[in-house]
Amino acid sequence: MEQLDVEDWEYWGDEYLEEEPTYAIRPGTRVVKVERVPMMRGDLRTSGATSSSGPATSYIIRPSDKQPTVSSGGSQNGDSVCAVCGDGIAKLHYGVLACYGCKGFFRRTLTGKYRYACRFSNNCIVDKFQRNSCRYCRFQRCIQAGMDPKAVRPDRDQTGKQKVPRIKKKQIDEELLNHMMRLQGDDWSRKLPVETRILLMQLMSIEDKVVKGDNNMSAQNTAKDPKSISLREMFESKPALDGRRMEIGYEPFRMARTEELGVIAHRRAIAAVDWVDSLTEIADAVDTEDKVALVKSCYSPLTIFNFSARTAQNTKNPDILCLCSHSFVPRRLPPEFNETNHLSNFLIDRTLNELVAPLRKLNLKEEEIVPLKAIIILNPNAKGLSEHARHAISELRDKVQDMLFQIVKELHPIYSASSRFGNLLLLLPTITTLSGLMSENMHFCQALGGRASGDNLLAEMFGDRTFDDQLISSSISPPLFENPAEICLESISPPMSDRRFVRRVDVATQTNDDLLSSGPYLPHSNSCSSMLNAGYSPPMLSTSPFPLLDDNDSAFQNDISLTELNGCEEFFSQLMDQPIIDS
């Protein structure tokens, strides 16, 4: 038996109802504090005098045989229950009975545009004791309970029309902060080590800056054409390109025009410069010459991977390749594309088949694409790197690879992380092969018309700068190179001055005079290469079952030098008189 000393009770028949949880206390009254004791309706019998003027009245509470009626959505004592977590004192919010906690959570989720993820099987317990354990399941429970997202009005947060607008503080690094907030909302990223998360946020910030470009055109920057700026000038005077970076977009809105291909190639070159400059700041051990070497090494593979990855993201059409100017090129090129060599060697067809199709199957996320870009750029075997730069770049590349493996392991916990990570790295040989085709096409473009376009940036990466100097000092007049078929091979292939042009001959059928006139060495020059490209096949292309003659043979000691001849005409006339023996 439990006796409670209270002051007033409202009577209604033989039953009583508690009107309020608080009571007015009179002097001399003993107060008993009851913490959330469920009140039961019962038969009340007085055990003493019932005078209201007495000091206190004792009541004996006995359970009643009548079962309490509980309405749907309400508790036993008449209070409404939250449809989401089951907490008491719920009111109508966004179409359902909900407590203030779930109402505020639902509103913050929609107005803040958060993105949650469940660490388990999307079936977490959501009650008033564990409702903060999993935000994803709590938000799903709000939707299932019937909360209407359209009922949330963000404009209700404003306190009224402000006569003086509030000044918002400018963030130091807005892109980095956005990625930080987005990654903090993802539960998988919280499992990454701190250093790995920082590196990932840095790479994502670099990608955002490269894609957005800049539109702050100033009069100071318009004085110099960006195409006339060299790679060294880009790294040493960074403000020279401010306002020259157009925004990059891969949405296939229209088909690209042939005259756009050069502009697209130039924009991708600037993007490669920005990527290299930002990554080398993280490495903090690379000078300008090393940066130039990295740009030359990564331009083609980075461009191929960018086009392929964004094509797999933005379209399911298997017959188009998206470019960075909101345009695309089809698999079957129109006839006008034959006028340029940018897309020769079946580059589009092979890229769609060998790279875009596997990327669609892998369905890469942005957190996987960006580290792959960094791995492509950070090539420690790039030609021209110093030994110190190779070591620094190799260390940074190892960190990025380890970060990529951690990301794959957290993003795809159901599948084998090691096999997916291996499939990602197996894309690199295909990218290298396709980038070789692209480099060859760019070499031809620079050889055929690159000098006329005046784009020194692409000419520095794919053209031989010594070619122009040799052309000026050469005795051959420039009109000889107007025919594309007679352009020097030196501009599209490595120097061959140290190679020997040797032809297979049958010693038994050759006289000593023939051997002396043929000569084993043909010094390389621009004029000779041009005439060789015009249609003359050198003797080295002929074959014979006999072995090559020994270089130390006495018959080859008296070779003919190009300087001893009176011009290339006399030299080639002697070569044309020599018989060529075919097998």
Curated annotation (Swiss-Prot):
Q: Which InterPro entries match?
A: HNF4-like_DBD, NHR-like_dom_sf, Nucl_hrmn_rcpt_lig-bd, Nuclear_hrmn_rcpt, Orphan_Nuclear_Rcpt, Znf_hrmn_rcpt, Znf_NHR/GATA
Where is the DNA-binding region?
79-154
Coiled coil region boundaries: none
Q: Please cite one Gene Ontology biological process associated with this protein.
A: response to osmotic stress
Give the location in the cell: Nucleus
GO CC, one annotated term: nucleus
In this chain, the NR C4-type zinc fingers fall at 82-102, 118-142
**Pfam short name (any one):** zf-C4
* Example GO molecular function: DNA-binding transcription factor activity
Would the keyword rRNA processing turn up in this protein's UniProt record? Answer: no
- Which portions of the sequence form the region Disordered? 43-77
For this protein, the record's PROSITE patterns field holds: NR_LBD, NUCLEAR_REC_DBD_1, NUCLEAR_REC_DBD_2
Q: Where is the composition biased (Polar residues)?
A: 66-77
What domain of life is recorded for the organism? Eukaryota
**Comp. bias regions, Low complexity:** 46-58
Report domain NR LBD positions: 195-464
Keywords linked to the UniProt accession: DNA-binding, Metal-binding, Nucleus, Receptor, Transcription, Transcription regulation, Zinc, Zinc-finger
Family as reported in the entry's similarity comment: Belongs to the nuclear hormone receptor family.
Task of the protein: Orphan nuclear receptor.
What protein am I looking at?
A: Nuclear hormone receptor family member nhr-31
Protein species of origin: Caenorhabditis elegans
Q: What is the lineage of its organism?
A: Eukaryota, Metazoa, Ecdysozoa, Nematoda, Chromadorea
